A protein has these predicted regions:
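Membrane-embedded translocation segments of transport machinery
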Residues: 103-212
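Transmembrane alpha-helical segments and their short flanking loops
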Residues: 11-34, 168-180, 205, 223, ...
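Signature of multi-pass transmembrane helix bundles
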Residues: 1-150, 283-301
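Hydrophobic alpha-helical transmembrane segments
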Residues: 35-47, 52, 93-96, 135-147, 190, 193-201, 245-260, ...
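Hydrophobic alpha-helical membrane-insertion segments
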Residues: 2-3, 96-104, 141-163, 247-269
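Alpha-helical transmembrane segments of multipass membrane proteins
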Residues: 57, 61, 102, 106, ...
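Juxtamembrane inter-helical linkers in multi-pass membrane proteins
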Residues: 72-88, 123-124, 164-182, 216-237, ...
Length: 301
């Protein structure tokens, strides 16, 4: 379904004047003979920019299949036919509907669905790349964690398609020799906000390890400090506990907001480069920040 939303573009033909010029040069003529012809699929639609279309295509494909099954619009085979073969014939009807429908829109009518959706979501993408939006996202993540719900899995799953679009633009800018300008991407939160995991609990693990007065606190600190270095802090969140604990929830929510503001100002002042790639989230903070910002040592500091 997704590939059918992409309008193929034709490869420009070599003009007669270029052909005449190339005939006088054997190497140039050989090069022109090797050039492809026909149509190609634009590669930019296969990247992060096409993620929204991919999500919509999945919904459309599933709904068409469900509709044909509920309404009985399918090829029914005799009972003697093996179930696997019968299911293959049943899926032919929705497949034909999808191919004809999407081909009519893209191939025959020439409607660029990617361009339309890109225009519609552009205000949302621009709004996400702001400090207030980033603070709201962080607050929502911490809010869900406060009740023991994995905030990153819920909020980040919704914001990730937009983050990837912004990150892709940063990567393209650096590849073209320009400066990346989008600050509000996922690696920004990962390496400058969630230090030691959601809520920046690495400092809390160190505090428990060396300053806790109770035996339980010291044991918890020694147990969680190593995982926290690699951004795994569920033992601290549920062991302290931070969940449903007002005394720890306040810094758990406020500290990431403060860190985000400081890091945003530093990046906006070009003290640190914008993130241009995704580094594995289990890396220690300085290493991950260094890699995500394209080898900028200031990010590690």
């Amino acid at each position: 379904t997704f590939l059918l939303t992409i309008v193929p573009v034709s490869i420009p033909d070599v003009t007669d004047s270029i052909t005449a010029l190339a005939s006088k040069n054997a190497e140039l003529n050989a090069f022109l003979q090797q050039l492809p012809s026909g149509y190609v699929i634009p590669a930019e639609n296969l990247g992060s920019a096409g993620m929204f279309i991919g999500i919509l295509s999945a919904f459309i494909g599933v709904e068409i299949y469900r509709f044909t099954q509920v309404k009985g619009i399918k090829i029914t085979m005799p009972a003697a036919v093996p179930p696997a073969v019968a299911r293959s014939f049943e899926s032919l009807t929705p497949t034909i509907i999808i191919i004809l429908g999407m081909s009519t829109i893209t191939m025959w009518l020439g409607i660029d669905v990617h361009s339309i959706v890109g225009t519609l979501i552009k205000p949302l993408v621009n709004a996400t790349d702001t400090l207030p939006s980033t603070l709201i996202i962080i607050f929502l993540i911490m809010f869900f964690w406060s009740f023991g719900i994995h905030g990153d899995s819920i909020v980040s799953s919704l914001a990730r398609p937009i983050w990837l679009i912004l990150l892709d633009q940063n990567t393209a800018a650096v590849a073209a020799g320009k400066v990346a300008t989008h600050i509000g991407v996922e690696p920004f939160l990962q390496w400058f906000v969630h230090i030691g995991g959601s809520g920046a609990t690495l400092g809390l693990a160190i505090l428990f390890c060396f300053k806790a007065k109770s035996k339980y606190g010291k044991t918890l600190g020694r147990t969680t400090i190593l995982p926290s270095i690699f951004n795994i802090n569920e033992p601290m969140i549920f062991g302290a506990p931070i969940v449903l604990n007002p005394m720890l929830l306040i810094p758990f929510i406020v500290i990431p907001l403060v860190l985000a503001t400081i890091a945003w100002v530093a990046t906006a002042m070009h003290l640190v480069n914008c993130a241009v790639t995704i580094a594995p989230w289990t890396l220690p903070g300085p290493i991950g920040a260094y890699l995500a910002c394209g080898g900028d040592w200031r990010a590690a500091v």
